[in-house]
Structure formats: C-alpha cells, structure tokens
Amino acid sequence: MPSGHNDKNANQESVEEAVLKYVGVGLDHQNHDPQLHTKDLENKHSKKQNIVESSSDVDVNNNDDSNRNEDNNDDSENISALNANESSSNVDHANSNEQHNAVMDWYLRQTAHNQQDDEDDENNNNTDNGNDSNNHFSQSDIVVDDDDDKNKKDAGVGVDDDHQSMAMAAVAAAYTLSKNNNNNNSIANDSNSRKRQHDNGNNHENSQKKRKNNNDDDDRQIGNVDPELTTLGDADDNDTNNDVIDRDQLVHKAIIDADSITQHPDFQQYLNTAADTDDNEKLKHIKDHLMRTHGLNHQNKNHNDDTDDLSNSTKQYSELQKDSMLDSSLNKSRNYMEVLPKVISQDTQPHQQKSPSHDNEAGSVDNSEISQLLQSAATKASSLVSLSSSSATPSTSRSNNSKAFDKAEDAALERFINEYEAIERLTRQQVCERIWSSDRPKDNFWNNIYKVLPYRSSSSIYKHMRRKYHIFEQRGKWTAEEEQELAKLCAEKEGQWAEIGKTLGRMPEDCRDRWRNYVKCGTNRASNRWSVEEEELLKKVISDMLEEAQQQQSQLHPNLLEEEQHLLQDDQNDHRNNDEDDDDTASAAAAAAAAIQEQQQLLQQKQQDDDDAIAAAAAAASSSLGDNKDEDKPHDSLGIQLDDNSQNSMVPAPSATSTHSKSLSNTIRRHNNKLRKSLMGNGKLDFKDIINWTIVSERMGGTRSRIQCRYKWNKLVKREAIAKIQTVKDDDMLWIFEKLRDLGITEDSQVDWDELAALKPGMKLNGLELKLCYERMKKKVKGYKQKSINEISKELVDYFSSNISMKTEN
C-alpha cells in the first residue's frame, strides 16, 4: 500500500485486496500470467546484454533528456490534476456530482494520454531501430526483435484494455455508490484530500530520486548502451508510479462500505444459509480424508500419476458425497410423519389396504405398528375423560344409558380423531368419509374409538360419531321443496333412510326425524297450545301401553319364576342330602328345560296371533279413514283433508291407504318384538322400551307428531314430579347430596339418576325426581353456575346438616 493512505484505508486493507483480485492486479500494464511475465523480462535482459556487447558509441544524451522531461511533465500533469480535483471538493461539499464527473473525466483523459504515449514510444522505437540497423546488426535480427516487441506489446495492450475496462466498471460502481454517502463522508474527504496531497508530493519526490539514481546508473554505461534502451527503465518506473496512484484511487473508489455490505440482500441470504455450511464442512473432511488415504502428494509424483490418482479420488469422493447427501436427507426426513403410510388418493376409498412393499426403504411402518399407534392414541384420549371426572373414574363396563355426551367426552373423541389423522395422514374430509363408509377395513378404527369411552355402548358411540362427523353439506332448516321431495321418497321407500338421505344430500337420521316429526302428519298436525282434552288423551294412550306391557310380563314370567324356584329348591336339597344320586338333579333340569321350551312355543303362537290382530286393526282404521273422504277436496297420504291453501305443501302419495297401513303395522311389530326381548332378557320393563312415540302419535289420531307427544309427556311428568318433591324430607335430601359428594363427579351429565334412586328403595323416588331435587336445591348455592356438581353437593350437605341440627335442638 502507498505510504499516504490514512488509517481508515489501512484498516480496510483486506477488503482492498479482495477488490484488487476482482479488478485485476494488471493495472500496471502487466500480464496476468506471472511465469510469462518473468520469461519476458529474462528475454529482454538477454537482448540488452547482447546489444551492449555488439553496439558502438552512440550519443543518446539528447533522447534521454527529452524522455525525462516528458516523464516529469506527465507527473506534473498528474499531480496538478489531483490537486485540482481535491481543491474543488474542498471548496463545496454539496457539489458532489461535479466532483465525481471530474474524477471520471480525469481518468478517461489520463487513459487516453497514456495510450498516446505508448503509441509515440512505439513509433520512436521503430525509427531508431531502422537507423541503427545498418551500423550494428543485420536486418533480419531487427525484424525478429521488432516482431517480438510488437507481439508482446499487442498482448500487453489486450490485457491492459481488459484491466482498464474492469477498472472503469469499478470506478462507475464506486461513482454510483458514493452519491449516497457524500453527506456522511464529507469531513473524512477533507482530511483524506490533505493527506493525499502530501502523499502525492512525497511520491513525486521519491520518483525524482529514483529516476536520478537510474540516470546515474545509465551514465556509467552510456557509452555501450543502445539509444533506444536508455529510457526503458525510466519509462517503466514512471508507468509503475502512475499506475500505482491510479490503482490506489480506483481501489478507494471501488471499496464498498462495511455497513452497505451488511445490509445487502445477498449478505443476509448468506447468513440465513449458514446451516448449509455444516454439510460443506462434512464434505471437506471427506475430501481431506481421501487425499490422505490415497497419498496425493503432487510435489513427489509426476503429472500422469497425479492425474490418475486424482481421477480415482474424484470418483470415490463423488460417491461418498452422494451417500452422505442421501444419509442426511434420510435422517432429516426420518420423523414421526415420514414413518407412516402415505395419504391415500382423494378418488379412492379411504383407508385401503397398503401393499407390503410400501415405502420400506423410507422407513414406513407395517400394520402392527399402526395398530400400536392407534391403541396408544385411544389410551391418551380416554385419559382426558378420567382427568375431567377427577376422582370418579368412569366404569369400564358398557351400559345402555343414553345420556347426552358431555364436553369432556367430545374432547376425548376429537383428540383421537386428530391422532388418527396424523397416523394415517388423512384429511378431515377423508376421516368423515371413513366414518360413513359401509366398508370395514381391518384397521380396528371403530374398536379403538369404543376404547376411548369404554363405559358407553358401541351403538351410542357409533351414532354420535356419525352425527358429529358427517359428510353432508346441509343440516338444519328444511325448505318446502325439500319436504315435498321427502314426502315423495317416503311414499316409495319409507324406512330406507340411507337411500333417501343420499338422494337429498342429508343425514339419514335427519330425513327420518323430519318425516316422522313434521312431514308425516301433514296439515293435520296442530301447532297451537295443548288443550286439557288432548293432555288427558295422551295420558290414557301411554297408560294403555304400559298396561299392555305389564300383561305380557305377567303372562311370561310367572312360569319362568316357578321353574327357577324349583331349580333353586333342587340345589338346596342337593346340599342337604349329599347321599342322593345326581339323577334327581338331572331330571329336574330336564323338566325345567322342557317347560321353558313349551313356554317359548306358546309365546311364538301368541305373537303370531297378535300380529294378525294388529294388521286387521290397521286395515280397519285405514278403511274407515277412506270411507270418510270428501271427494271435492284433496287428501294427504293419511286420508286427512287438505285446505286449498295447503295443497302445495304436501304431495299426495299413490296408494296412500295401503302405504300407511303397512307402515303402521311394521312399526307396531317392531315395538312388540323389542318389548318381548326386554321381557325375555332380564324380566324388567323399561319405559323407553315400552313407549314408542310413533305409535302414540297414531293413537292420538295424527293430530300431534311423535316429537310433540314426547315433549308434552315429559312436561306432564316433570309437573307431577315437582309437586311430589315438595314433600321430600331433609333427611332424604341430605342422603342424596352425600351420595353425589362421595361420587366425586364434576359434570351433571355424568350422574346416572336411576342407579342412584335404586340405592335407596324406601325413599320411593325415581331418577327423574332425584334429578329435579338436585336442580331445585342447587339454586340455593351462590354462584352455582360457575361451580361443579361436587362443589354444590358439599355446600348442600352442610346446609341440610345445619337444618337437621337446628330442628333437633328445637
């Protein structure tokens, strides 16, 4: 670096070197190839020696003085130009554009001047060589020398042109960048300009001293040196000094500020991709290992051996590089999602069987591992219900309790569905299609869902999942057109709800409920307030159905109970009389089996008779409805007259009488079969098994739909229960809330009120009445809406305990 550089430029020396590598060190009119440059210098030196030995005395003082004067003039012009440039920048910092234009003009002018000097030197050399050729050496030697010099100069000019072009590009870049930094660097430019002037003066003095020393050396050999070569050294020195100054200026102009580099997008991208350097370091270590393994020493082996070894090493290195990249990609992708089967196509049925060779190399798991993951997901989801119920862990035995699903149960099912989506790599739509699919792939999907809520029946979970995760676009309000289409379909396919739902694009359960709750009754369905007569009729219908169920129970179970008593008596006799033969027990068992078989035959015969009677009654009811038709007005499928305003609301079905009779007969038959199964099972009658609200609606004359009858009955029962619980004693209330407290449950929906009522038969309260007691008494607790049932029960226990204590004291 020149001595005149300031501290800031010295600190940026590494950056300058980087710029010099880009711009080119050949700004001093030298070739890029250092070997070629050295060889040219040796040739010139040998030619000088030959010319000195063969030349005669030639007077070259005048030429030398003239060349020196030209060099001095060039230096003066350079210094004056720089001083003028710096002085203009010191006068007005705001005029930055003129300063840079002056630098560009000076650089172009200096370049043109240097080219002109090179052409003049070439012409002078050609003239002098022609004059001296007759006295010192032959014409052929001169031609050879001239050709060599010309080729070298041509090569040098080509290289210089390239370097000058690159330098001009660098100056242009610095020129553009410096426009943005003029205001921030004005003070620094003032100090730099003063130092540069001082450095230029020192450089000029050093160049004069150097030329003087060279002149002294040349004077000692002046008598033996060719006149053409007397100024060769001076010209080289002058060009070197000028090029050093020019290069320093270009380097300073082309250096990018450090702040600009850090804010450059490419530099930020380099920082963001720093993680990729780890792989490059690994590859570098592999390459170094190969170099050490194969002993590639280029200094001790010839070129052929080096080429062969290097080619072999390159092949092995490329192979190891591929292996390394493959291993790294596999390691990165070997996560939880990659080891699972791929997502199936949208066009195919969800969860098709995977082939055994499916992505074995990528680390996919087989069916056994998938099954383990699903079981683990079911266990985790089931734990949510256990945690939400605090100390009360749900029973693992399944029950037929049809209470509503609470938030904890829905959260557990949702947790399993999310895990299932991740394991099988399916979308939510594909999972819903899987739930509604009629196929049953061997993936234990439903079995694992049932494990999430082990205390609920499989049918209740199945229905709840299909309601919650449906695949239908429409749910909710029905339009008049949809109801008309539903009426047409039900007239043809009543009971085939899957096909009807598929046609309408709705859930089968929605179609079924809409038909029997609203559309089936048509305009005959009343929507006004229930009258007293309607309430009494509803009570009579339900009372008759309960009485019929009790009659069936009395006909079936007395014989069965009698046979069971005989069997128990036989067992007791066996224990008392150990000496009796086992034949007596066998004969008693055989007799009991024969009696049961005979009873079953009687039941089958009675069932057939009942079915025939029901069919006859339905036909008679249909015929009576048909006889009362008014031919002047349209009728619905039940034979009910329609007003003129309601003709468009219902579509008459063909063969209405036969369709209604068949539907009613099938409904009654299914109800009786269900009731008999309950009686044959445990001998107990459940209200939900006895009462079929469709039959209730039919016995009400079709004036109220099944859902209206059910809602009205629940209100009537609740009204009577509220009147009954008014007489419940504090001791019974204390017992109720102590049991609720001991259960440790947190949600109202987790209580089985019927089982709770069975724990104390003497209290004579059913499950509904116990629930009403709780709902009535919890309002006495302050902030009961924000408290759990367990917290409410604790406070009510304290409340009734204090009441009982006060009554006892009084």
Curated annotation (Swiss-Prot):
Residues 692-717 form the Myb-like domain. Residues 346-355, 643-667 have a biased composition (Polar residues). Residues 51-64, 124-135, 180-191, 586-606 have a biased composition (Low complexity). Residues 470-523 form the HTH myb-type domain. One of its GO terms (molecular function) is transcription cis-regulatory region binding. One of its GO terms (biological process) is regulation of DNA-templated transcription. Residues 497-519 bind DNA. GO terms for cellular component: chromatin; nucleoplasm; nucleus. Residues 1-80, 114-161, 180-243, 294-313, 346-365, 572-667 are annotated as: Disordered. Residues 1-10, 29-44, 149-161, 198-208, 627-636 have a biased composition (Basic and acidic residues). SMART domains: SANT (SM00717). SUPFAM superfamilies: Homeodomain-like (SSF46689). Keywords: DNA-binding, Isopeptide bond, Nucleus, Phosphoprotein, Repeat, Transcription, Transcription regulation, Ubl conjugation. The modification Phosphoserine is found at residue 355. DNA-binding protein that recognizes sites within both the enhancer and the promoter of rRNA transcription, as well as upstream of many genes transcribed by RNA polymerase II. It is essential for cell growth. May stimulate or inhibit transcription. Specifically recognizes the sequence 5'-CCGGGTA-3' or 5'-CGGGTRR-3' (where R is any purine). A member of the general regulatory factors (GRFs) which act as genome partitioners. Acts as a chromatin insulator which are known as STARs (Subtelomeric anti-silencing region). This is DNA-binding protein REB1. It comes from Saccharomyces cerevisiae (strain ATCC 204508 / S288c) (Baker's yeast). The gene is REB1.
